[in-house]
Amino acid sequence: MEKLTLSPISRIDGEINLPGSKSLSNRALLLAALAKGTTQVTNLLDSDDIRYMLNALKALGVNYQLSDDKTVCVVEGIGGAFQWQNGLSLFLGNAGTAMRPLAAALCLKGDTESEVILTGEPRMKERPIKHLVDALRQTGANIQYLENDGYPPLAIRNQGIFGGKVQIDGSISSQFLTALLMAAPLGEGDMEIEILGELVSKPYIDITPAMMKDFGINVDDYNYQRFLIKGKQYYISPQTYLVEGDASSASYFLAAAAIKGKVKVTGIGRNSIQGDRLFADVLAQMGAKVTWGEDFIQVEKSELKGIDMDMNHIPDAAMTIAITALFAQGETVIRNIYNWRVKETDRLTAIATELRKLGAEVEEGEDFIRIQPLALDKFKHAEIATYNDHRIAMCFSLIALSDTSVTILDPACTAKTFPTYFSEFEKISKNQ
């Protein structure tokens, strides 16, 4: 297995221009494909998950031109539901941001009835999709499980979604609601979505209506409890759509600066629609100096204090706090993060396991993690298993800010969202 050893870093200094957000990139591509008109999507992320979406769109008859550097994509919208040859199979890797929205969009009524199969890697077949399928079935969608109930692969017939009242469980993933919201305007009738339970990752939900509005559709949101969307509408191309820098990916550079230096991250700012921008506020609460601009966030180190906080609203970026906690004074508790368990891997167990290898004292609860700090000279060298999870690989790069080197196994797994992560991290790592 490939491995990468990072030597101890004495300070962090520099500027990072963020690649496009994964979730925004895939949503923008899908909306552009469904819209009337041609859309130029810029600052598109070049990564595995985006390639799975692009390959699926091509198989569904969508024409697009991708620039040589793969960051600009001109998409010719089809102006309604997808059409495809019966028996099509789409392989979506482990890309939840492709699987969930496509599962909903492919239910929309086509001119000719056809079946499509959505499948992916073994881990994708372990990632729950029942809450979305249950909701789609309430609207009249025809979806079958091909292996295990509640999980991909799925067989979908484009017989339509017919609106009405729909209840969806919001406790596992905000992507289920996102998928339903994006498909609803092209359905056969008006839809009223009622959220059961506490909606997780609320700021991630805010992204979806904001993007839908850019493509000409309004969503009425009643305090995250109910959403109303009119049916029989069309998305209209905004002609160009700029994908914001990935706020989750910003977290590693910002945390590195909070621990040992100063960094300016561009491509995201105070007006970002991404919830993970709030990560910088958590660093500020821990003691870091944070400066916000229209198109940048700057963080400078200061003495960090541990924190006890519900981080359900920023689950991806919260992982970075678990590492930052080692460098703070006093214990850190990250709460209400059960949804870590249903991501690319069971992130709660994975992070607790790898932190212990470093010599950290960690308590793993069902939906929380408690971490004690470590003195810089007390870190043990460890080989960090990454579980084919891009965010674990990126998080644990921060261990090199101690007095000990760290070895990351399978570093190439960052290709899911940030193929050039380690070279970017090296640019801001100084050793004098």
Curated annotation (Swiss-Prot):
Record's subcellular location: Cytoplasm
Binding site for phosphoenolpyruvate: K22, G96, R127, Q175, R347, R391, K416
Keywords noted in UniProt: Amino-acid biosynthesis, Aromatic amino acid biosynthesis, Cytoplasm, Transferase
Binding-site positions, 3-phosphoshikimate: K22, S23, R27, S173, S174, Q175, S201, D316, N339, K343
Protein's UniProt keywords contain Cytoplasm: yes
Keyword Transferase: yes
Pathway entry: Metabolic intermediate biosynthesis; chorismate biosynthesis; chorismate from D-erythrose 4-phosphate and phosphoenolpyruvate: step 6/7
Swiss-Prot/TrEMBL GO biological process terms: amino acid biosynthetic process; aromatic amino acid family biosynthetic process; chorismate biosynthetic process
Cellular component GO terms held in the UniProt record: cytoplasm
InterPro entries in the record: Enolpyruvate_Tfrase_dom, Enolpyruvate_Tfrase_sf, EPSP_synthase, EPSP_synthase_CS, RNA3'P_cycl/enolpyr_Trfase_a/b
Active site: D316 (proton acceptor)
Function: Catalyzes the transfer of the enolpyruvyl moiety of phosphoenolpyruvate (PEP) to the 5-hydroxyl of shikimate-3-phosphate (S3P) to produce enolpyruvyl shikimate-3-phosphate and inorganic phosphate.
Protein name, per record: 3-phosphoshikimate 1-carboxyvinyltransferase
Taxonomic lineage: Bacteria, Pseudomonadati, Pseudomonadota, Gammaproteobacteria, Pasteurellales
Gene name for this UniProt entry: aroA
